[in-house]
Swiss-Prot record:
Gene3D superfamilies, sorted: 3.60.21.10
Alphabetical list of SUPFAM superfamilies matching this protein: Metallo-dependent phosphatases
Enzyme nomenclature, EC number: 3.6.1.41
Species of origin: Cronobacter sakazakii (strain ATCC BAA-894) (Enterobacter sakazakii)
Keywords associated with the record: Hydrolase
The name this protein goes by in its record: Bis(5'-nucleosyl)-tetraphosphatase, symmetrical
The keyword Transmembrane is assigned to this record: no
Length: 283
């Protein structure tokens, strides 16, 4: 039995299938972990959701910012952008079932035996694990409730950007979703910066990647995340793994086998040749 962790799929269904064939993934015996952003940009978001849902207990995933945006589009809150290529999913006969399944997926995965946690963007250094788990449950409960459109309508925005246990209501939920799904850079005190899109080498002082600021979770657990394709899986501490390697932009889909830390890749079926693609990789 093996545990395979794969970075952001972004609708790259063919590459996902090829990568799972490469590692000889066996549902029912092996477990697949997915860092979120299953949908958008690649051509096969519908097929990805259908396949991942079919895996049942053999998959553990987290929601990413593009997954949350899809929920907002389906709810009529946000606009369907042609570049996201999700129209076939929105118009599918099983769209309701897929969306209802997706909005009941978690923001955080924890395996105590493996001392392993996974979140789409990472874990803010301002949180210990019990706080992260409680915060994840707050948003997950709203997403699974009938009032989820209210949260989806309020989730867009960059403030508040500093954690406080005294945060309440939609402001609290927005901070939590930003920390789990959009975070890249922080100030030295752990306060989020939602604006910088530079590479770590070019980021202005005093900003640092969230994983470069000591936090309590990383002291006890390995952390797996996606979201940040321009890292190309490099530059993180030894126990923190960046798995988004930009498959939908012409890069690769990356898989980490947890038991021996072997890394497998599947090249994208497309090339990043447009200015929009290059800008997206840089961000």
């Amino acid at each position: 039995m093996s545990t395979y962790l794969i970075g952001d799929v972004h609708g790259c269904y063919d590459e996902l299938v090829a990568l799972l064939q490469q590692v000889e993934f066996t549902p029912g015996q092996d477990t697949l972990w997915l860092t979120g952003d299953l949908v958008a940009r690649g051509p096969g978001s519908l097929e990805v959701l259908r396949y991942v849902r079919s895996l049942g207990d053999s998959v553990r995933m987290v929601l990413g910012n593009h997954d949350l945006h899809l929920l907002a589009v389906f709810a009529g809150i946000s606009r369907n952008k042609p570049k996201d290529r999700v129209t076939p999913l929105l118009e599918a006969p099983d769209a309701d079932e897929l969306i209802n399944w997706l909005r009941r997926q978690p923001l955080l995965q924890v395996d105590e035996d493996k001392k392993l946690v996974m979140a789409h963007a990472g874990i803010t250094p301002q949180w210990d694990l019990p706080t992260a788990q409680a915060c994840a449950r707050d948003v997950e409960a709203v997403l699974a409730s009938d009032s989820y459109p209210l949260f989806l309508d309020a989730m867009y925005g960059d403030m508040p950007n500093n954690w406080s246990p005294e945060l309440t209501g939609l402001a609290r939920l927005r901070f939590i979703s930003n920390a789990f799904t959009r975070m890249r850079y922080c100030f030295p005190n752990g306060q989020l910066d939602m604006y910088c899109k530079e590479s770590p080498e070019s980021a202005p002082a005093p900003l640092k990647p969230w994983f470069a600021i000591p936090g309590p979770v990383a002291q006890e657990y390995a952390i797996v995340f996606g979201h940040w394709a321009s890292l190309e899986g490099k530059g993180t501490p030894e126990n923190i793994y960046a798995l988004d390697t930009g498959c939908c932009w012409g890069g690769t889909l990356t898989c980490l086998r947890w038991e021996d830390k072997a890394v497998f890749t599947q090249h994208s079926n497309r090339q990043a040749d447009s200015d929009d693609d290059k800008a997206a990789i840089a961000s």
